Structures are given as structure tokens and as C-alpha cells.
Amino acid sequence: MSQQLQQAVEIAYSSTAEPALKKQALEYVQNVKAGAGAAEVFVGYLGDAGTSDVGRFVALQALSELAGEGGPARLAFLKDSAMRALRGETGGVWGAPEYVRNKTAEWVSRLFYAMYGEVNGNMWNSFFEDVAQATGVAGLRGSAAVEYNAAGLDAFLRVCAAINSEIGDQTFVRSKDAQVKNNSLKDAMRVQDVATLTSIWRHALEAMRQDVQRQDVAVLVLQCIGSFISWIDINLIVNSEYISTIYAYLNYPKTRIACAQCLCEILSKKMKPGDKLQLLGMLSLTDKVLQLGDVEVEVHEQLAKLTSSVGLELSVILEQCHDDSSSAGSCSIANSADHQIIHQVAPLVLKFMNHEYDSVTQQTFPFISHYLTFLKRLFALGGKPGSAVALNSKKLPLDDDHRQFLTSLIIVCMNKMKFDETCSYDDEDEVEEFVETVRSKLKVFQDNIAVINPAIYMENISKHIKSLLLGNSWRDLELAIYQMHNFAESIRNNLFGLNKSAISQSQPAQLMTTFMQDILDNSAIFQSSNPLIQISFFELIVRHYNFISHTGKNDISILSIFCTPFSMFNDSEKVRLRSWYLFSRLIKVTKPRLDDESLSQLLSKLAPLLAVKLLPNVANDSEIDTTFDNQLYIFEGVGILIGAKAKEEYSILDGVLSPLFADLESCIAAPVKSPEIVVQAHHILMAIGTIARGVHAGLVPENQLNNPQVNAALVHKSLIEKFSNIAEVILVTFSYFNKYETIRDATRFSFARLTPILKNDIIPFSSRLISIFLESDLKTIEMNDFLGFLGQMVHTFHADDNCYQLFNNLFTPVIKKVFDLVAQVEQEGSLASGANTAPAVSKVANGKNVVITDSFRDKVQLKKAYYSFLQSFVSNNVTSLLLTTANRNILPLILSDLLSYTPAEIHETSSMKLSLNVLINFVKFFGTGRCADFKDRNANTFEPLEGLSEFFITKVVPLVFEIPFKPEYEFNIDDGSCLVLAADLSRLLKALYDVNGDPANNASLKYLTEAYFPQVQFPQELSMEFIQTLATADEKAFEKYFVSFIKRMRS
């Protein structure tokens, strides 16, 4: 059997074997595992002298799995086998590769998990004694001066580590039952064996201290102590002799990292402040680290982490004693802890923080962050007035020691913020990583110092920025700009604790203004070709433009900087595109009122960027023209400049639009509408619409954009004429390209941007626009957007008679277009199902047994847009449009749709809610055949629609009862969505009752009592109760009754 297993293992783990053969080999090994005598087979295979290391690993893997599955007899057999393996009698595991030794330890730990402690019936309570004897380390319980087996100690320690991974490792999420068992095993170990284990570890460390050959094993001991410390009695480890023994291993290169990690784990153990302070006093860490001198970076990382851990624990002691400042003992402990931080830990932390490798620097951040947070509670003079920091600070005078610490810290932060010599500015990943992991954290520390003592911050950052601006390196200039940004943000966020009214004239603000003046006059900045400097410069200018306004630089001089190769004409695409956005952003924020001459000169400089050029490989609709998307920012910025200019004369707009119009004419004249031509036409329409949006934004204050009176007062007649011409151009273009979806999108976009300027003057153009859209072959998503566009028009122009007439003429064609598209979507869904294709399907989230296809989802989205369109007539008091002579014939189609639903539609809650809301409002406003909306100016213009009242009654009443009670609708009143639906149905029935007047002659009540209830054989007593409640209860009370009624009837 062993020979067959060996062959199977060799094949299964071979890199050259055929896949089919490897599969057979793996199946053979699995079958052996599942066999009745698997334990005996794999123990025999493990002990076979011919078994390879990989074979031993497979055998041990199988035995580990079997240890968790067998009964007492199998466990006893496996226990004996494991002991023989640990004694080196079988399996050859002592001298095996590390992965085999680890797997052996895992096997033994699984036996521990299955047999140790009361939770396992005390099947193997002598586990650790037996393992210690088997591995030859039992003598280390009492003394270091004994002979021991180094390979056996290695095995013993790996077993200990495996056991901790099994029961003590907190990185794994375990079930509640597993956690209970783990806790029971740890309790048993604490009582019986932990003291023995800690003795063996300590004596092993003492025995190996001078044995360079065994330092690898010492690493295992230190790892065991570090991993067990979280759940064993701290007093077993924390005593001067034990800590000294561990501490000594900082002296040896091979053990430094493991020793530092072990000490960090010990330090993180929860203890009373006094006890923790005593432990920290044992370490004399500062002296030890200084003695080590130059070591590897990895060692420096661990030493930095260890130092930071010491500082963090001292800082925690400070915080705890500060919160319990009533006792003299707490004050004494706090003073001692702070003294250690300032005089011992801080100098070392700052040394590590200033290390050339960022990985070392980062280890110090937890301590620095915590300690600064504590210092804010004592000393903070800044912080926004009324903020938690300002209110909670004791505002104690800053002593010399803490002043020196804060000064040294901010200097180190500033030094470490600079990109080092190895960093290349064009390595975006490296730059981003440094900013996110190091620089951003240092900025927070810098800000905290500003809050604690604004004077220290001001003095040092001003020196730093001045020094950097004099530097020649791109690293100096980049950091200067970054620090200016930080300084400006500290003013914006009022880290200095100034009164709001005093900020603009404060010393920090004046200093920032000086810095802005300096950077605008700094020739080295503008001579730099570094993208980081170029982008960060303009980010600074735009973000903190308010400081420039006091420098004497006018708007046109700043905007002119953008119109140079340093910015918008830069060779670097990244800089160029970002500058386009920032140019627009600056204009949007400042809205400069330029005179015509200055604006004309600026537009002349920008002219090359105002031409729409089609880049190669973007003719395909699926391609994204990133350059053009960013170019739109320029068009918007130019529009704002034109809208905000000093004079109300807009001939300058022609200079921007004429080249675009000429290009559109070329597109229209092209005999073949190639993809390139279509894309160019789309881009030009988008540019025109974006310019229009910019003009409006420049003309009207941002907080008044939707105020009709303000808009009307600010829009000059000449501008309306310009925009009317734009509308005409767009319509002509659209008429030639209306079969292209991208053109339809761009047309709708542009038209919507003309509306705020043209107002009612856009209605004649809109009539033609809508007609062309209705002639187009629209996709579902386009129709959704188009209906939204129409709804917005109803909202904007509902009081305009021309708009009323427009929709009177076009309402019926729009409705027909919607239902034609609904029918098309349904047909596509049927064809897909009939052809046995696989449309995407998913169960609806409400748990109903309804399958939703893509076509059904498209239909639902279209219906929602359609219902919102109908609701716009209700919301804007023009429901009379549905009763005009032109639209009466389409009304039956509309109402039929609102009064009939499939089971799948019933469970689309959002769509149903919209639909029923429309139906409720229709019942309220023309449920009697006459328009009852007193706000509708045309309500009395038309004759009543005969028979409409009876139609509503005979259709609404059955609908209200069929939806909750018909089996095919699967209506579950306990489901939240169905509960919402029931509430809407109750409102519908109540609205029907209300519009039919006096209870004594109410046609809806009469239909219920004389026709519907008898027809469905409704009990007489319940009928009277229902009628009575409907007639007397208000809407809310009837809703509550109707829900309980459904529950009663379905129970």
C-alpha cells in the first residue's frame, strides 16, 4: 500500500504528469483517506523509509484531518503514533524540511484539540508532559543547565505555536461553539500547564543565549511568548529576570526582529498604569536601541515599532491618569510617564521618524497621533471657537520641554514631507503611495501642532515655505506649493482659534497673501516642466484664489497664466486636461466681469482650444473621447466669462459660435454621414449646449439660477436673439441627424440649456423638436429621458397658453409613441423567450415567485417615466389637457393601462406606487367627467366627458378588491411592499367615494352595495360595516381599516 501511495503522490504532485493521470492519482489518495483503515495506512506510509518529503507531508495532512474525525480507539492509535514520531522513532520528521515539521506540529495540535481537557473527557491531560518527554526538553522545566535535544525543542515549540493558532489566534472568526471550546481549553492550560511552558521557554532562551547555531530556535521561543502573552497570566513573563532574558536577544542580528515583535506584544498587554510604568522602566529601551548602531532596515522597522509601542503605552498611561486625576498616585504616575516620553522615548521616536526609509517612519505614527491628541487636551490654544478641541482644552501654559518636542516634531514632519532623491515625479504609483501613506499623516500632525500652539506652527511653516521657494530642486518647489496649500487650509479651517470676523485680516491671512504674491512672481515655477509642480500650482491658485485678490494681481493676469504652454497648452496631456478643468473652476468661483477688450484678447488666446477636433479612433460609439469631455470645461468657462462680462452686449458670442456653426454646416453638407461626421456633430452640439449653460451661470447668481423673476430681469433682449439663433441651428442639425442616438442625446442636452435664457420663447422651437423626436426610432432609455424632458417643460411653462396649446397638439402622439414602444419591448421579450435565448433574469428582491427579464425591466422603467410624465400634468394643474377634444380619444388607452396589471407588475412597488398615485389624482380631478382642479385655468373650457364617472366606478372598485384577494397576484399583506400598495388602494377607493358626493346619493356606494358586493357574495353584515367606514372615516382612518380588513379576510 505504501508503494502505491508513493506512486500516486509522485504523480499527483508532478509538474510533468498528464492532467488526467494527476486527477486519477488525487482520487486514489482521497479514496484511501476515506477508507476504514485510513489511519493505519497513513501512519505506515509516514514511517516507511522510502517515503519522500512530499509523501510525508501528504500523510501528515491526512492524519491531521483524521484526528478530528475518529472515536476514542482511533485517537488512541494516533496519539501513540504521534509520540513515536516526536521521539524520532518513526517518520523521520526531526530532520525534515520546515514544511514537514510544521505539518507534524499541526497533527499533534489537532490531537490536543480533540483529547485535552475536561471538554474532551480528559482523554489526554498529560499532553504537554508527554510531548516534552518525547521531544527531550522536559529537563528545561527546572533549569537551563541541562542537556536538551535542539531538534526536539524545535518540534516542541512548533507544537506550542500550532496550539495557539488553533485556540488563541484572534485573527480568525470562529463559531460561538468553537470559541466556547477554545476558552475551555485555555482555562485548562492556565491551571495545568502554562507555568511549565513559560519555564521551558525561559530556560531555553537562557541556554541558547551564547549558542549562535541555535538562534533560529530562539526565534521560535520568542514567537511563542509573543503569541501566548495575550491570554496567559502576565506575571509569568513580566519579571525582571524573564524580561532581561528576552531583552538580551536584541543584541543578536538573527533574533532582533523576533525579539522586538515579542516585546511589542508584551507591552500591548492590558495592565494597571503603575504596573505598566514599572514594566517600561525595566526595558531602558533608549539606551539599548542607541547601542545597536547601524542595522538592517527590517530591524529598524521593528525597533521603531517597539519604541512607538513604548511611547504609546506611556501615552495611554498619561490619558488614564489624566481621567483619574483625583488621586496623588495618579498624578505621580502621569508625571513619571510624561517625563519618560519627553526625555527618553521622544528623541528616539523622532530619530526613527526622520529615517530615510518611509517604512521605518510609519512605525512611529500611532504614538505621535495618540500623544498629540493628549497634548491638545492640556495645551491647545487654537481650534475653531466652539469646537470640541477648543472647549475641552485646559489651555495650560506650554512648558519648555513640550515646546521643544513640538518644535522638533514639526521640523521632522516638514523634512519627511519632501519626496526623496529616489522618487521620480513621473512614477504616479510611487507618488500616490507616498502622499497617502506618509505625507497625509504628517500633515495631520502638523495641523495638530497648529491647534496646540499656533505660534510654533506659524514660525516654522513660514520659515519652511520661504526656504523652499529659494530652492532649485523640483522637490523643493513642489513641497513649497504643498505647504502653502496646507497653510491656506489651516486658515480656512481656522486651526488658530480666531474669531470669524478677524480671519481675513489676521496675521496668517496676511502671510498667506504674501506667499501667493511670492509664488506668482517666482520665475522658477513657470520655468519648470514638472507636471506635479504645474498641476499643484494651479490647484493652489484655484482653491485659494481669495488670497490672490489682495496681491494686486487682476483677474485677466491670472487667467492669462492659464493660456500658456505652462498650463492649458502644455505638452503633458495630464497637465493640459487638468488645467482645462481648473480654468473653468476658477471662472465659476470668481465670475470675473471683464471688459470686452480684455475678454476678446483672452478668447483670441483660447481660440485653438475652442475648435472641436475629432481625435483618431473615437468614431465608434463605444469609445470615450476623454479629451473632448475635458474640453467641455473650456466651453463652459468661456460661456461664464461672456455671461458675466461688464457690458450687456453679446456680439462677442458670435466669435465663439460662428466656427462651430460652420463646422456643423460641413457635417450637414457631407453626402455620407460617416461615424466620424456623426461624432463631430455630436461634439459640436454638446459644446454649444455647454456654452449656453455657462452664459446662464455667468449671468445669474448661483443662488438665483431657478428664480424666474431674477432671470427675466438679467437676460437682455440681444441675448435672447442669439439663443434663438442657436435653437434654430440645433433644430436644423437635428433634422438631418435624428436617426442617430448620440445626436438625439446631444440635442436634448443642448435644448435644455437654452431654456433658462429663452424661457417662453423656446416653445415654438420645442414644438418642432418634439415632432422630430416622435418621428425618430427611440430606444427605451431615450424615451425615458425624453419624457423627463417633456415633464420639465410642463413644469416650467404650465402657465403659458402657447405651451398649453403645444401639449394639446402633441400629447396624443407622445402617448401613442410610449405605447408603441411598450408593445415593441413586450414583443422583443416574447421573441427572446420563444427562441429559447437566455435573457438575463433575476428574482425580485421582495421574495415573490416572479422572474424578471431584461425586457420586463425595460418596460417597468419606461412605465415609471411615463407615469411621472402624467403626474407632471397633475402637479402643474393642467389635467384639463386630457379632456380636450384633441386628446379625449387617447384617454381610454391611458385609463385602461392604469386600471389593469399583471402579477409581475403588482410586485414592482415603485412603479405601482407611481401608477396608483396618478390614478388617484385622475379620479380626484376628473373622476366625474368634469375637470375639478380649481387651479387649472382651462378647467371650465370643455364640456364634461359623459360616462367617465360610471367608467371609473365600475373599474376602480373591482381593482381595489382583486389585487389583494386574487390568488394569481400572490398579495401578502404582511410584506412591506404589499402594505404600501394596500394603503394606496384605500386612498384610491376613498378618492372615488369623495368625488361622488353626498353619501345618500353616492354612486360609488350604490355600486358597491347593489352590484359589486352581491356579485362577489360578500356577507351582508360585513358589507354594511365596510360601507359605513368608507363613508364616515377620514383617509388615514380608512387606510388603517382597509389594511385590517384585508388581514381579516385572508386569515
Curated annotation (Swiss-Prot):
This protein's record includes keyword RNA-binding: yes
Localization of this protein: Nucleus; Cytoplasm
DNA repair in keyword set: no
GO BP annotation list: tRNA processing; tRNA re-export from nucleus
Regions that span the bilayer: none
Keywords, ordered alphabetically: Cytoplasm, Nucleus, RNA-binding, Transport, tRNA processing, tRNA-binding
Location, primary (coarse class): nucleus
Residues in the signal sequence: none
GO molecular function: small GTPase binding; tRNA binding
GO cellular component, one term: cytoplasm
Domain of life according to the entry: Eukaryota
InterPro entries: ARM-like (IPR011989), ARM-type_fold (IPR016024), Exportin-1/Importin-b-like (IPR013598), Exportin-T_C (IPR045546), XPOT (IPR040017)
Primary role: tRNA nucleus export receptor which facilitates tRNA translocation across the nuclear pore complex. Involved in pre-tRNA splicing, probably by affecting the interaction of pre-tRNA with splicing endonuclease.
Similarity comment: Belongs to the exportin family.
PANTHER family in the cross-refs: EXPORTIN-T, EXPORTIN-T/LOS1
Protein name as it appears in the record: Exportin-T
Organism: Eremothecium gossypii (strain ATCC 10895 / CBS 109.51 / FGSC 9923 / NRRL Y-1056) (Yeast)
